[in-house]
Amino acid sequence: MAAKYITIAREIKKRIITQQYAANEPLPDQFALAVEFSTSRMTIQQAMRQLIVEGLVYTRQGQGTFIRKNFLQLSQWDLSGSDYFGATKTWEHLGTMTSQVVHFELRFPNEKEQASLMINPDTPIYDFIRLRLLNGEPMSLDATVMPLNLVPGLNKTHLESSVFRYVQETLGLKIMGSYRVVRALKPSALDMQHLVCEPTDPVLEVEQVIYLEDGTPLEYAHCHYRYDHGGIVIVNNG
């Protein structure tokens, strides 16, 4: 299961996106939210910090927490640079998320994968590529590797639904952080085939490592997005 503050942050985010909370009004105070979600004020504070990091809300000292006015102007394809919920949770409020498995095998890691996942050369890994679609429209092409020993029993059914749901709800692992590098690339043959782009169309690549709460790398991935399907939102709250 995901940490409670993450679950609460997701619910508040959903309410913001569906405009249950008006952009010109403060969010309910932390005490009211703690009562509603049957939790502590500290957990609500953690949820608020997560939403601040994602760029959804900001605080005014002595006045409360407010929704950023420009948040709803973002493209449906935009995602937070700090988001590590997985594609299904990130975009499910916009419609139906589906995945097509392009490739799935078990093999040993190369040197880059060993370094990124902090594993030995003889540690088996899952290697899979998935086309992620939102309401039937190609969204991203994700190439992912995961250590077999951390995610035992992973199969095609999980890949077609939600790997992160399997990891968190079935295996009970807690995902707590990510490291990402974003760059523009020329499309590969797979990109052109599955993302329906031209040889001259750039793709946005997010190279990432997702970590468990104890700092263990869970996933090393390269996610490719069409250039015209939004971008990565980076928020500086300093």
Model features per residue range: what roles?
Residues 96-238:
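C-terminal all-alpha effector/ligand-binding and dimerization domain
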Residues 43:
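Residues in the helix-turn-helix
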Residues 30:
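Helix-turn-helix DNA-binding elements, focusing on the entry/boundary residues of the two helices
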Residues 4-8, 18, 22, 26, ...:
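HTH-adjacent hinge/linker in prokaryotic transcriptional regulators
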